[in-house]
């Protein structure tokens, strides 16, 4: 990476965790990802989850149809794990190059996860098949028991689900997605080469005070929820250290304004327009720009066993204001950092 004071030039990055939705929303949000990233791991939690090869092929085509001319973008599809998923269908999708990975949502952990897994034991034959195939398991790492405080769900998941699973299937490749706690940061750091993590810009930039003090800020509400400052700092220190098994995963998750600004709002930050510049700002603040390219563009492909993108992206130190909103057919989207000035932006 070359890093003059005003320009950052890096290999074209990938987004290893994104929600592109469907229908009109998909058509609106896809270009914000396809313009910047060479590839993206696409989450399968649509209203009708992606559980079959045919459904994934059809969804992939809808995504590709929404990619503007001139954008070189490859969506990497994932399979939504359910208690009744057919392991043969999953293996077929992996061998045919349709499924890159499979996603484990604990039932009711986040948006459109009611079809999720009730217990790891229920899908153990599928996970054993994935271990044999070398197919990555992507994990939303939170327990959903009613008695567990929402701020403790990730740490509890490590102890009661993640560690027993990894002890049982020692060669299963696992991505601990959107980690939010010092517990998870330490767990991944202490893990072996079969364990990696993605980290979002919002969890690096903010903590729960930013969301709750002086008025509630619904556009910072996401799941896993923002945690204490000590957890934010642990994540920042992990990426600043140059740790090679952590990589970019925005978890960009658009919801229309009326579904966010309501008495029972949806979880998710639509950060695709400003995420790369947000990451750059964090690395700069941590005096860690030397590790920025690896986090964005190299660590993910290394873990997934994929080639690094051939192209390049330049970020320029050019203060720009994030739009207040983005028009939808019958509503609007409020992007992450709406109305705020960002230091780094992608050169068009």
Swiss-Prot record:
GO cellular component: cytosol
Catalytic activity: (S)-dihydroorotate + H2O = N-carbamoyl-L-aspartate + H(+)
Binding site for Zn(2+) 1: 17, 19, 103, 251
Superkingdom of the source species: Bacteria
Binding residue positions for Zn(2+) 2: 103, 140, 178
The protein's required cofactors: Zn(2+)
Job description of the protein: Catalyzes the reversible cyclization of carbamoyl aspartate to dihydroorotate.
Matches recorded under NCBIfam families: pyrC_dimer
Cited HAMAP family: PyrC_classII (MF_00219)
Designated name of the protein: Dihydroorotase
Species, as recorded: Salmonella dublin (strain CT_02021853)
Lineage of the species this protein comes from: Bacteria, Pseudomonadati, Pseudomonadota, Gammaproteobacteria, Enterobacterales
């Amino acid at each position: 990476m070359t890093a003059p004071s005003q320009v950052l030039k890096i290999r074209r990055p990938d987004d290893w965790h994104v929600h592109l939705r469907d229908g009109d929303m998909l058509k609106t949000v896809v270009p914000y990802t396809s313009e910047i990233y060479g590839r993206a791991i696409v989450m399968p939690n649509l209203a009708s989850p992606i559980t079959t090869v045919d459904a994934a092929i059809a969804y992939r085509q809808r995504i590709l149809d929404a990619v503007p001319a001139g954008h070189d973008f490859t969506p990497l599809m994932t399979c939504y794990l359910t208690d009744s998923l057919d392991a043969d269908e999953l293996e077929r999708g992996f061998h045919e190059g349709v499924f890159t990975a499979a996603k484990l949502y604990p039932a009711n952990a986040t948006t459109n996860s009611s079809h999720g897994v009730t217990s790891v034991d229920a899908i153990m034959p599928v996970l054993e098949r994935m271990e044999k195939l070398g197919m990555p398991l992507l994990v939303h790492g939170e327990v959903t028991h009613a008695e567990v405080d929402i701020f403790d769900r990730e740490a509890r998941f490590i102890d009661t689900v993640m560690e027993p699973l990894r002890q049982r299937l020692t060669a299963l490749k696992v991505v601990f997605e959107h980690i939010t706690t010092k517990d998870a940061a330490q767990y991944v750091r202490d893990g072996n080469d079969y364990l990696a993590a993605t980290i979002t810009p919002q969890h690096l930039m903010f903590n729960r005070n930013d969301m709750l003090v002086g008025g509630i800020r619904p556009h910072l509400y996401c799941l896993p929820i923002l945690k204490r400052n000590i957890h934010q700092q642990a994540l920042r220190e992990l990426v600043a250290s140059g740790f090679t098994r952590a990589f970019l995963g925005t978890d960009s998750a658009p919801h229309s304004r009326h579904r966010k600004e309501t008495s029972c709002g949806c979880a998710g930050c639509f950060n695709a327009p400003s995420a790369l510049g947000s990451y750059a700002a964090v690395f700069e603040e941590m005096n860690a720009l030397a590790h920025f390219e690896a986090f964005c563009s190299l660590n993910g492909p290394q873990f997934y066993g994929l080639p690094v993108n051939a192209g390049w992206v330049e970020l320029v130190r050019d203060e720009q204001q994030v739009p207040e909103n983005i028009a939808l057919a019958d509503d609007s989207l409020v992007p992450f950092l709406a109305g705020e000035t960002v230091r780094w932006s992608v050169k068009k």
